[in-house]
């Protein structure tokens, strides 16, 4: 029986490349001259450092621009609150989301069942497996999910016949 998995995962290699490009641009930009603005990464956690709130916004804009150029969806980013770290310096922790959350998985399963397409959807960890008898049914489910779920970027992989 044909099947595929619905997942939500950012390409961490491209995220790392975007961070390196952001740091390079920040170090050469005139408006950041003499400031301690930078982006650091620890696994799925990014930390933005800047001298004040305005420069933090500029660092965030540079990072978003570089991520977009590398085809990483910015909806993967979950922004924490801005913290003061001594003097005027500020930092913000940004988490890169991974996996389909429980609520989203239930929503996907409900959408698939309500669509009356002859397929079955089951939650498997941080992915949703959709199986059906016809490949055309699976392709119509993919089209329907792309149209209905807009708040989280979805990937469809592990397509088996």
Curated annotation (Swiss-Prot):
One of its GO terms (molecular function) is nucleotide binding. It comes from the Bacteria. Keywords: Nucleotide-binding. One of its GO terms (cellular component) is cytosol. The keyword Magnesium does not apply. It holds the Pfam family DUF520. Nucleotide-binding protein. Belongs to the YajQ family. HAMAP family: YajQ. This is Nucleotide-binding protein Bamb_2603. It comes from Burkholderia ambifaria (strain ATCC BAA-244 / DSM 16087 / CCUG 44356 / LMG 19182 / AMMD) (Burkholderia cepacia (strain AMMD)).
């Amino acid at each position: 029986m044909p099947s595929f998995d619905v997942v939500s995962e950012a390409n961490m290699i491209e995220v790392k490349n975007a961070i390196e490009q952001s740091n390079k641009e920040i170090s050469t930009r005139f408006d950041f001259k003499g400031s301690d603005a930078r982006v650091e990464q620890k696994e799925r956690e990014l930390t933005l450092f800047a001298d004040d709130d305005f420069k933090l916004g500029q660092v965030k804009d540079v990072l978003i621009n570089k991520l977009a150029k590398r085809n990483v969806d910015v909806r993967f980013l979950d922004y924490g609150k801005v913290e003061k770290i001594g003097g005027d310096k500020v930092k913000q922790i940004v988490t890169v989301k991974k996996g389909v959350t429980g609520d989203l998985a239930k929503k996907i399963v409900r959408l698939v069942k309500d669509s009356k397409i002859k397929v079955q959807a089951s939650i498997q960890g941080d992915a949703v497996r959709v199986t059906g008898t016809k490949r055309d049914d699976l392709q119509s489910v993919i089209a329907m999910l792309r149209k209905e779920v807009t708040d989280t970027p979805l990937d469809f992989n592990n397509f088996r016949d």
